[in-house]
From Swiss-Prot:
Keyword flag Signal: no
Family the UniProt entry places it in: Belongs to the VPS29 family.
GO cellular component: cytosol; early endosome; endosome; endosome membrane; late endosome; retromer complex; retromer, cargo-selective complex
Subcellular localization: Cytoplasm; Membrane; Endosome membrane; Early endosome
Main localization, broad class: cytoplasm
Modified residues (N6-acetyllysine): 50
Membrane topology: Peripheral membrane protein
InterPro entries membership: Calcineurin-like_PHP_lpxH, Metallo-depent_PP-like, Phosphodiesterase_MJ0936/Vps29, Vps29
Keywords attached to this entry: Acetylation, Cytoplasm, Endosome, Membrane, Metal-binding, Protein transport, Transport, Zinc
Biological function: Component of the commander complex that is essential for endosomal recycling of transmembrane cargos; the commander complex is composed of the CCC subcomplex and the retriever subcomplex. Component of the retriever complex, which is a heterotrimeric complex related to retromer cargo-selective complex (CSC) and essential for retromer-independent retrieval and recycling of numerous cargos such as integrin alpha-5/beta-1 (ITGA5:ITGB1). Component of the retromer cargo-selective complex (CSC).
Name of the featured protein: Vacuolar protein sorting-associated protein 29
GO biological processes: endocytic recycling; intracellular protein transport; retrograde transport, endosome to Golgi
MF terms in GO: metal ion binding
Length: 182
């Protein structure tokens, strides 16, 4: 089961669109679920995601125009409970102790957060944490040189194989990280 994880698009305020090389990779009919950390910013970005998969879950980012998105969400995909937040609630941004507290409060196997615009994926105390980064490479308050990235999770039974796609220069680099539920 393929799950696309992305966020912080900031279209059209900071970027015009997803990189063309990412659009070529993201084709309709291949992905079953989309988990978005927010800051889509427009209905058009949401409509684009709906063309890729029927099951789209979005949480509200600090720049989203739509107030209909929830602040947080817990989604079950296969054997995994996945928590989804934008990440501006985590202080300081990306703080491990704050993320671990949210993971315990949500009682999830995987916690997905964004906001920092920097990709991260790691295991901590037998739980898995993912920050997909910014799919467009939009700048943030602290940095302008952001590497565009998104994540595809391949969920099979009690294993998640995470593929991170990063646009470095003109090349899409892919890294593989595996997490087994204990």
């Amino acid at each position: 089961m393929l799950v696309l994880v992305l966020g912080d698009l900031h279209i059209p305020h900071r970027c015009n669109s997803l990189p063309a090389k990412f659009k070529k990779l993201l084709v309709p009919g291949k992905i079953q679920h989309i988990l978005c950390t927010g800051n889509l910013c427009t209905k058009e970005s949401y409509d684009y995601l709906k063309t890729l998969a029927g099951d789209v879950h979005i949480v509200r980012g600090d720049f989203d125009e739509s107030l209909n998105y929830p602040e947080q969400k817990v989604v079950t995909v296969g054997q995994f409970k996945i928590g989804l937040i934008h990440g501006h609630q985590v202080i300081p941004w990306g703080d491990m102790a704050s993320l671990a507290l949210l993971q315990r409060q949500f009682d999830v196997d995987i916690l997905i957060s964004g906001h920092t615009h920097k990709f991260e994926a790691f295991e901590h105390e037998n739980k898995f944490y993912i920050n997909p980064g910014s799919a467009t490479g939009a700048y943030n308050a602290l940095e302008t040189n952001i590497i565009p990235s998104f994540v595809l999770m391949d969920i099979q039974a009690s294993t998640v194989v995470t593929y991170v796609y990063q646009l470095i220069g003109d090349d899409v680099k892919v890294e593989r990280i595996e997490y087994k539920k204990s």
